[in-house]
Each structure stands twice: as structure tokens, then as C-alpha cells.
């Protein structure tokens, strides 16, 4: 048995300490503080690999600072069951509300228009002239023979396809075959209304399915890449077509009318979210400052940038304003409480080599670090945070005590000393995968309007997803729906990154509570999925909620007639008693297994360890290290 765990190995291991089950009052219903309707299992993480946290959230866990918790939805005392919700961004279909949010935001940035209905009265002479010119051009184009235009369009699209990072590796003969088969065709009259005048089949890629599978590339991804690059690099008005993803591996070409052309020529480029998916470009714009740009000079400057998690005076002041006005919290906030909730993170960071490591990792200090004794003394009781993103907020006494035990020593200062810069992340599930910019780990996104900080998004970037932790904003800009806009921005980031890192395609929105009205907004990002907490299978949102009735708050979502139902009722430990010996323990400089513990201590420890095994599952039982302080 290996009794000593070397530091190099320890630096890539997850160290946790389970605290068991606890109950607390619920923030999502009117049950009252006396009713303990929220039942969870919790543990503290000193350090946690991004892959291990990905596995945890795929079993219903979430984090609040360094505290990890998993709601027990099946407990009869649970009043508001919480289900993990995620969106596959490759299939994202913007709703009417999503589109309205972007339009409203763009109107303000471009024209300083706050109400959409005012836009019709703000047209300038220049706008009218442009409209006239466009109508004239459209008429002339319609009188032309389209052959030359379509051939040029076809060539431009083939060039985009061949520039795909994966396709670019094809030999010249295969590229020639692609060129010969990727031909735009005229649709029949009965199909024009549904599919547009022209279409392009990508069926030729079925010939290369083995190569695609080998590199985890799908035909859908190639189509999405083509549409994205076309919209990004080619002026649609040159061709008068919109490209849309069709059925059976096709791209459809639909004519643009004059009002659409005018709208496209003046719209902001801040968000480029695609309907029906996006594996998107290989660029990662959010790692650098993203500025709104248009053909006309915008009335406002809008920027998004990613930073290390920090508690500056500017950030903390915005947080206090948000909590007071939006959540009606009049109690005084402290920096130390804010740090424990939204700055401290157990995730071991992997920073992209193109980024400055110091720019993105929290070093235990802050730019305005006068985090004086007053903060530490006053923070014996943590703040109540009622989170829009429904994260656990440290608002029950057990969690306050547990989290406070860990804030003093290792987490703030050592977690980033063991992180590193790397172009890749080695994972058990996918092997070696690329590192996105800025990296894997926990980050803050700053939203600035004319230089003023108006929003902060707290996010975790993991091997398969961007997980939204919390978002707070300046209530003075409530009219911009910044909460909704930030979600769309995060979805777009995932869409772009997934083009070069295919498995990183999900957007996690925390928990969904069907009985809670303020959770309904999460249903606006479709097609989303809910996690079945008995099988850990993802189920399409509408199908999942069909099992939830007013008199049935909790339900299993996934059913398989071929499965052994009796076996499902067994716990992980009952199925695999040998897992007890697979648990790795660590105390001081020693690592050991259950059989190495004295019989007396085994008797004291056994029930706690079995409970832990049943909550983290077989794979994490073997990976996490049960850490005794």
C-alpha cells in the first residue's frame, strides 16, 4: 500500500471532508423559517479538480464558495425539490423573449433607445436614404440572372468549409471530392416556402464518417461552423440570403427582404447566438475585452472581460447595492462574507498559456484589501443570499460553521499555487483535451457600460460546460435585463468554444424548482434538460416536468423497462461493498485505506464513510481523497 502521497500527485488530487446531512429553512417558498424543508448532504473541498467537479454536478451537486452540497429531493420533508438544469448550446433555439432581450439591449447601445416602440420615431434622413438604396439594389438584383451570384456564393462557402481546422487536414484528393459534391441546388417550388430557394447538402461527409468519429467531429458541427463563419466573415447583403440549418444535413438559403438587410447592417455584434446550434468559431472573444461595434458609431461603449475572482471596492459596492435593492436585504454586508460566497473556490485552475497566470488566479489578496478586523469579527454570522441563480448561499447555520472552519488557511493561498498553465487538460473521460481561453476553473466576468461596472458574472469553466454560479448587476440598469443578457452571452461563449473543444458544449444554470415562480425564466433557454436524480440520466425538459404535478413535487424522470428495478433500490455500497476499501484517506503526510485504520476507529468511521460513498458514487469514491485535518 502506498502510504505517502507525493506533493506532485497531491497537487492534482481532490481533497474533501464530508460533513453529512443537514436541514435548513427554504428560501423558495413561504413555509417559514421554523420549517426545515431543505434537506442536503454537504462537504467542504480544500481543493477540487475541474473534472471531479464536473462529475459531481452531473450527480446533482453544486458549490457555494468551497462548500459542496447535494439536495435530497426524495426526502419527505423536502418542500421544494431542486433539479440540475442544463442546455446543450449546439441545439439552442432562441425564444421570442431571448430575441427581444438582445434587440432591446442593442437599441440602447446603438441609439440610446430605452423603449423599443420609440425606435420607429427615431429614423434619420440617412436611414431613409439607406433604405431607398437597399430597395433599389434589391430590385436590380432580382432582375439579374442569379447563376453568377450563386456560383460565387458556392465558392465562398466551400472556402469556409475547407478552412475548418479538421477539414484542412484532408489530402488534396479528398478536398477535390468535397468541392465536386458540395454544390448549391435549386429547390422545387413546393419546398421554397419551407426551405428557401436554394439548399446545400453535406451528405458527402458520410463518406468520411470514420475520420469524423475518430476526432469526435459531427456533420452538425461542420454545418454550424459554416453558418457561423459565413455570418461573421461575409456580408449577407452581398448575396441577399440568410443561411439556416435544415434537415438531413442541409443548409437552406432564404432570401433577405430589405428591412432585414437594413436591420443587419446596423445591429450590434456583441452577441452572435445562432438558432439551432453553434459549435462556432475557434476564437474565444470573451478572454479579451469584447466591445460593441456597428457600421454607425454606437451611442454607448459596452465591454465584457474575464478576470480572476476578486473582491475590489468596485465589485463589492455593486454587490451590496444589488442585494439591498433587488433582494431587499438591509443587513450590512462584509467583504469576508462576499469572498467566502463568490470569490473563494476549491477548483484547481488550468490557465491557457496565452494568458498571464497572475491575471486570472486568486492569490488570497485583493486590490483594495483593507479587509480589516471589522469584517472578520462581524462575519461570525454569514449573510443570507437569495440567489437568482439559486446557488446555496451559506444561509443556514451548519454551512456557516463548516465554511468558516476552512477560510483561514489553505484555500485562499494554496489553491492557485498548485494550478498551472497548460494548453491541454488530461481527463479520465476524454483523454487530453484543449484548454479554452482563459482556462478551466473559477472566474469573474465584468460587464462595463461606458467604463462603469454594471454587472459581474461568477462562472466555473469545466471540461464539459460553463456553469453559471451567480450574477449581480446595477439596479439602475434594470431596464436592460442584464441577467437575461448575461445568460445569452455565456451561451454564446460556450457555442464558440465548442467548435474547437467539442465536449465543452453545455451551459449549466444551477437548479430548477418547478414550484418556484422565479425559476420559470430558466425554461426560456431551450431545449434544456433536467437531471434524473435516481438514474443520473438527462431528460428533455418538457418530458421531465410532465412527471411533476401539484400533488407530486418530486419524481423520477428516466424509466427503462429493461432495467432491474430491484437492483436500482440498492445503494452504491450495497451494490459494491468493496468500495469501502477503495476510499482514500489522508491525514497530515499519510495516505491510507479503511483497512489500515484500527478496528476501534473503523467502528466510529464506517457509517460516515458509507454515507459518503452513497452520495458521491463509485467513480468519485476512488478519485476523491477523504481529508482529515
Swiss-Prot record:
The keyword Transferase applies. Residues 356-396 have a biased composition (Acidic residues). It is an enzyme of class 2 (transferase). It comes from the Eukaryota. The keyword Acyltransferase applies. One of its GO terms (cellular component) is cytoplasm. Residues 282-295 have a biased composition (Low complexity). Pfam families: ATE_C, ATE_N. GO terms for biological process: cell migration; cell-substrate adhesion; proteasomal protein catabolic process; protein modification process. One of its GO terms (molecular function) is arginyl-tRNA--protein transferase activity. Involved in the post-translational conjugation of arginine to the N-terminal aspartate or glutamate of a protein. This arginylation is required for degradation of the protein via the ubiquitin pathway. Does not arginylate cysteine residues. Belongs to the R-transferase family. This is Arginyl-tRNA--protein transferase 1.
Amino acid at each position: 500500500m502506498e502510504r505517502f502521497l507525493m506533493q506532485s500527485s497531491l497537487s492534482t488530487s481532490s481533497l474533501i471532508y464530508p460533513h453529512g446531512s443537514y436541514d435548513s429553512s427554504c428560501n423558495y417558498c413561504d413555509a417559514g423559517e421554523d420549517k426545515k424543508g431543505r434537506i442536503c448532504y454537504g462537504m467542504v473541498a480544500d481543493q477540487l479538480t475541474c473534472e471531479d467537479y464536473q462529475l459531481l454536478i452531473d450527480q446533482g451537486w453544486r458549490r457555494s464558495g468551497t462548500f459542496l452540497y447535494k439536495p435530497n429531493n426524495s426526502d419527505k420533508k423536502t418542500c421544494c425539490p431542486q433539479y440540475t438544469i442544463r442546455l446543450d448550446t449546439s441545439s439552442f433555439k432562441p425564444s421570442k423573449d431571448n430575441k427581444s432581450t438582445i434587440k432591446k439591449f442593442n437599441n440602447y447601445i446603438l441609439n440610446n433607445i430605452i423603449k423599443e416602440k420609440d425606435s420607429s420615431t427615431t429614423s434619420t434622413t440617412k436611414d431613409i436614404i439607406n433604405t431607398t438604396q437597399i430597395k433599389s439594389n434589391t430590385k436590380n438584383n432580382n432582375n439579374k440572372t442569379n447563376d453568377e451570384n450563386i456560383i460565387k456564393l458556392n465558392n465562398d462557402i466551400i472556402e469556409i468549409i475547407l478552412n475548418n481546422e479538421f477539414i484542412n487536414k484532408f489530402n488534396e484528393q479528398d478536398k477535390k471530392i468535397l468541392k465536386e459534391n458540395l454544390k448549391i441546388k435549386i429547390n422545387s417550388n413546393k419546398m421554397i416556402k419551407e426551405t428557401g430557394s436554394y439548399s446545400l447538402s453535406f451528405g458527402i461527409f458520410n463518406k468520411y464518417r470514420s475520420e469524423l468519429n475518430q476526432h469526435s467531429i459531427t456533420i452538425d458541427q461542420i454545418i454550424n461552423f459554416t453558418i457561423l463563419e459565413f455570418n461573421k466573415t461575409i456580408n449577407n447583403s452581398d448575396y441577399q440570403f440568410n443561411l439556416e440549418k435544415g434537415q438531413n444535413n442541409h443548409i437552406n438559403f432564404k432570401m433577405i427582404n430589405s428591412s432585414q438587410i437594413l436591420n443587419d447592417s446596423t445591429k450590434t455584434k456583441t452577441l452572435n447566438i445562432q438558432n439551432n446550434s453553434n459549435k462556432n468559431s475557434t476564437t474565444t472573444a470573451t478572454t479579451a475585452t469584447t466591445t460593441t461595434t456597428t457600421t454607425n458609431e454606437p451611442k454607448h461603449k459596452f465591454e465584457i472581460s474575464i478576470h480572476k475572482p476578486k473582491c475590489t471596492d468596485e465589485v463589492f459596492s455593486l454587490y451590496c447595492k444589488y442585494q439591498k435593492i433587488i433582494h431587499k436585504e438591509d443587513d450590512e454586508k462584509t467583504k469576508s462574507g462576499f469572498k467566502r460566497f463568490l470569490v473563494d473556490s476549491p477548483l484547481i485552475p488550468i490557465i491557457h498559456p496565452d494568458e498571464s497566470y497572475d491575471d486570472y488566479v486568486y492569490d488570497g489578496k485583493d486590490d483594495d484589501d483593507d479587509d480589516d478586523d471589522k469584517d472578520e469579527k462581524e462575519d461570525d454570522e454569514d449573510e443570507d443570499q437569495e440567489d437568482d441563480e439559486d446557488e446555496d448561499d451559506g444561509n443556514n447555520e451548519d454551512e456557516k460553521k463548516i465554511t468558516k472552519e476552512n477560510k483561514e488557511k489553505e484555500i485562499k493561498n494554496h489553491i492557485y499555487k498548485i494550478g498551472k498553465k497548460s494548453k491541454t487538460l488530461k481527463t479520465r473521460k476524454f483523454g487530453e483535451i484543449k484548454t479554452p481561453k482563459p482556462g478551466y476553473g473559477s472566474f469573474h466576468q465584468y460587464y462595463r457600460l461606458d467604463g462603469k461596472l454594471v454587472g459581474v458574472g461568477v462562472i466555473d469553466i469545466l471540461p464539459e460546460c460553463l456553469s453559471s454560479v451567480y450574477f449581480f448587476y446595477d439596479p439602475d440598469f434594470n431596464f436592460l435585463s442584464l441577467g437575461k443578457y448575461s445568460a445569452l452571452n455565456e451561451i454564446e461563449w460556450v457555442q464558440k468554444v465548442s467548435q474547437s473543444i467539442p465536449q465543452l458544449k453545455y451551459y449549466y444554470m444551477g437548479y430548477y424548482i418547478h414550484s418556484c415562480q422565479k425559476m420559470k425564466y430558466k425554461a426560456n433557454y431551450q431545449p434544456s434538460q433536467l437531471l434524473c436524480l435516481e438514474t443520473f440520466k438527462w431528460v428533455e425538459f418538457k418530458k421531465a416536468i410532465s412527471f411533476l404535478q401539484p400533488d407530486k413535487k418530486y419524481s423520477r424522470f428516466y424509466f427503462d423497462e429493461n432495467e432491474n428495478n430491484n437492483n436500482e433500490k440498492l445503494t452504491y455500497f450495497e451494490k459494491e461493498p468493496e468500495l469501502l476499501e477503495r476510499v482514500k484517506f489522508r491525514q497530515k503526510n499519510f495516505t491510507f485505506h479503511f483497512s489500515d485504520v484500527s478496528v476501534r476507529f473503523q467502528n466510529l468511521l464506517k457509517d460516515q464513510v458509507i454515507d459518503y460513498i452513497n452520495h458521491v458514487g463509485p467513480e468519485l469514491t476512488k478519485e476523491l481523497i477523504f481529508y482529515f485535518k
